[in-house]
Swiss-Prot record:
One of its GO terms (cellular component) is chloroplast. Keywords: Chloroplast, mRNA processing, Plastid, RNA-binding, tRNA processing. Transmembrane segments: none annotated. This is Maturase K.
Amino acid sequence: MEELQGYLEKDRSWQQHFLYPLLFKEYIYIFAHDRGLNGSIFYESAEIFGYGSKYSSLLVKRSIIRMYQQNYLIYSVNDSNQNRFVGHNNFFYFHFFYSQMILEGFAVIVEIPFLLRLVSFLEEKKIPKSQNLNLRSIHSIFPFFEDKLSHLNYVSDILIPYPIHLKILVQILQFWIQDVPSLHLLRFFLHEYHNWNSLITPNNSIFLFSKENKRLFRFPYNFYVSECEFVLVFLRKQSSYLRLTSSGAFLERTHFYGKIEHLIVVVVRRNYFQKTLCFFKDPFMHYIRYQGKAILVSKGTHLLMKKWKCHLVNFWQYYFNSWSQPYRIHINQLSNCSFYFLGYLSSVLINLSAVRNQMLENSFLIDTVFKKFDTRVPVIPLIGSLSKAKFCTVSGHPISKPIWTDLSDCDIIDRFGRICRNLSHYHSGSSKKQSLYRIKYILRFSCAKTLARKHKSMVRAFLQRLGSGLLEEFFMEEEQVVSLIFPKLTSFSLHESHIERIWYLDIIRINDLVNYS
């Protein structure tokens, strides 16, 4: 980020807050590649044309030279659409590759104002960079749950509505990006996206292009979600005597992430022409969101949560001109329900404990209530995800993976083992890890059936010939991983590893098999 700031300080066009001229700057594409922001297109796509990786910068320069030509973008897209059935026409590949390269650079450009806002926010709050990296872990939210949710009463499970038209997204961006050519170019890309998306064919090279251009088209939706959260800060500013403890918005690679603590509940009356605002101060309210799902928890009453629900529905309707169904917001009492978030089924358990109290010659038994935040793995939905991925049937019976039979034995075992270890790593915070045994069983026998199908033998005969230990080393248990990380913790027994929850700070995205909501 410091390198990009150094380039922008020297660039006169950026000093006048113009984004469009940055599209012709070579350092934008170099920055996109060096930072790992979908940079694979600069190497993998170059190999399709027969170039090595050392020619990637040459392709960038050629693309910039062609963009100086009048109406190049329009001709490039039209040529791509007209030649979609030509086959392996190099003319088609070159034009399509240049278009995708422009997309990669433009995706970085439109994020620059918000990245700089993030840097200024971190400098203002004096947040060290190392702590900023920890904020990227989605598992860091669960320790926050453990500290706060046991003292709260109600939870609102919210599904943020999707905007009905992309034009609304561009209109929202106009408040933050005043560069008109950049907005027109963004509108052009969004309009032509459906044509490019229709180019998905079994050909791996074409699928690569379609897979790599999602970053730009996620950006308007992520900004729309951020605007939905911005109303909380906006309404707080309308009430000068009510103080918001802390608020912040963090721009990550693919998702906006915001966590606001101690919100001030502000509900606008139905008569929007009145200037009277009805304030409900609730210092014990917390808001958490990931992607399009949000959780709003409060210590207040059920009436307060219903007012929040009414407020959110009206806000989406009048501000974004989109109808939001009230059933997308569920209000439940924490002690009587479980809510799904980030692949975990979370709830607040109530434990009763009898405490003996001795007072002089009399003794009393006092019943004490303890609330504990609990997280478990929803096994049935996870089996459904494995079924969609063709690892098992709907009922959970393991099946072979025919598409992987062309791979070597080591590659097959490595793929299954990596999936199993990633699931165990992601669900390390579950209080009952025994529920993952069924998932590991499905993956192990699916791997064995795939290998047996490749060698045209029965599963039992294949395992007897090579031994069941063939698969064990590729499915390392979580307690063995913990023992490698913390070798001095000799008291960490096998039984305790299935009870204690472990949250890792290296998980920056939800697991693909877990993202089934």
